[in-house]
């Protein structure tokens, strides 16, 4: 039997044990993390089904969020995965982007342990989405391989993130006046198709500077450099209302390398080649003609090929002006040769006419001498020189005559001269390099006639008697040889009337027109200097000019 003192002690021990057990259970409950409970709930598919069913219960996707109330704000941003190519002929560009849109739909708010509902594209068709379209897009494609490339997420507060992968071909108006030193601002415009700004507006998610991202590895273009992008927004009015339009400008600057190799350097080399013809002799007509025609055809081919990479614009570009000036230089080189050839022929014709008049004047000289006999020379010095030469001729003949019977030969030989009182130097005729020239023909006649009159007046040595010198004597032929023979030939060609025959007065050869024309000499300096000055002005103007198109800033 338990004593009365032990009963209270046992009851107290049970109470303490119960209190301790309760404290331990409470501590265990407090130490249990809420994440584990949330994880357990996430692992249950019934939670997702319950939340989605509750969201779509009574939801009408035909009505925008806040219908009849405040304006729906759609925030957008763009991530460019690939930019290009850019077509100058079609004036368009193509790019691949991730196009993101964010808005708040309070009808999709939910309570639960799940912070974000990550859903597939099947949910997109069951909720309201903005009717965004690209205003300047020519063709836009939403990728569907292997499934539609769409991302759809619903946050607990009703915020919705909708992302699509798109390939967009958009129009890029280009002003090609400065081609190929030009730059362009290619726009991408998008907005709501049906909702005016009184119901829906667009804004940039990260602000104007960071809402459009273009990585460097995504903008590797062949003919352009993507130097940056800017954003703006504008309001467009139409008969259905005013609409907000968001615009992104991609700034492109053209690369010059291709056009330098393909057009500019060949044009410069062709012009230089056309100017080489100025250093070719003007008589080389085939060579200079080939130079001119070949360079003109080459410039024509270059101008045609340069236009293939451009649209058929009605104005001239910077490259068109350069090609036109190069073509003008090449064509001018061909015209220059035509001018040289023309003036050379004119000069040769004038020289021929002067040459044809000279023999007529010479043939008229003997006729004047018959009417007006020549008087003795008035110049005493020339007369004395003539007499000395004739005296030397007589003395030489006399020395030879002492050993040879001159009398026998003189009866058989004809004398060189006829009796006359005219005095003209005979030795001048014999020493002349061309005794049959027009200038010496008249002097030859006078010299042949003047020999007998000169001999008697010439003082002689003692024991010698002056006498006529027969041309045909052997001693004379031995001593003077060819000179007297030329005199004899000239005298025999003279007729009884004293006129020169046509055969004794051969006309001088006509001028050949060889040498360098003055036009060529001027062209050798003028053409290169002018072309160099043109290139200097051309490149300084266009390389220092700001040719980048300006985008409109309407923020």
From Swiss-Prot:
Region (Disordered): 354-435, 495-516
GO MF: GABA-A receptor activity; GABA-gated chloride ion channel activity
Residues annotated for 4-aminobutanoate binding in this entry: 100, 163
Chief location category: membrane
Free-text tissue specificity from the UniProt record: Expressed in the brain.
Keywords of this entry: Cell membrane, Chloride, Chloride channel, Disulfide bond, Glycoprotein, Ion channel, Ion transport, Ligand-gated ion channel, Membrane, Postsynaptic cell membrane, Receptor, Signal, Synapse, Transmembrane, Transmembrane helix, Transport
Known regulation of activity: Potentiated by histamine.
Membrane topology type: Multi-pass membrane protein
Ranges of the Cytoplasmic topological domain: 281-284, 342-518
Extracellular compartment segments: 36-259, 306-318, 546-555
InterPro entries named in the record: GABAA/Glycine_rcpt, GABAAa_rcpt, GABBAa4_rcpt, Gabra-1-6_TM, Neur_chan_lig-bd, Neur_chan_lig-bd_sf, Neur_channel, Neuro-gated_channel_TM_sf
Sections of the chain in a coiled coil: none
Glycosites: 47, 144, 157
Keyword Transmembrane: yes
Keyword flag Membrane: yes
PROSITE patterns reported for this sequence: NEUROTR_ION_CHANNEL
Disulfide bonds: 172-186
Function text: Alpha subunit of the heteropentameric ligand-gated chloride channel gated by gamma-aminobutyric acid (GABA), a major inhibitory neurotransmitter in the brain. GABA-gated chloride channels, also named GABA(A) receptors (GABAAR), consist of five subunits arranged around a central pore and contain GABA active binding site(s) located at the alpha and beta subunit interface(s). When activated by GABA, GABAARs selectively allow the flow of chloride anions across the cell membrane down their electrochemical gradient.
Record text about domains: The GABA-binding pockets are located at the interface between neighboring alpha and beta subunits. GABAARs subunits share a common topological structure: a peptide sequence made up of a long extracellular N-terminal, four transmembrane domains, intracellular or cytoplasmic domain located between the third and the fourth transmembrane domains.
Complexes and interactors: Heteropentamer, formed by a combination of alpha (GABRA1-6), beta (GABRB1-3), gamma (GABRG1-3), delta (GABRD), epsilon (GABRE), rho (GABRR1-3), pi (GABRP) and theta (GABRQ) chains, each subunit exhibiting distinct physiological and pharmacological properties.
Name of this chain's protein: Gamma-aminobutyric acid receptor subunit alpha-4
Organism of origin: Bos taurus
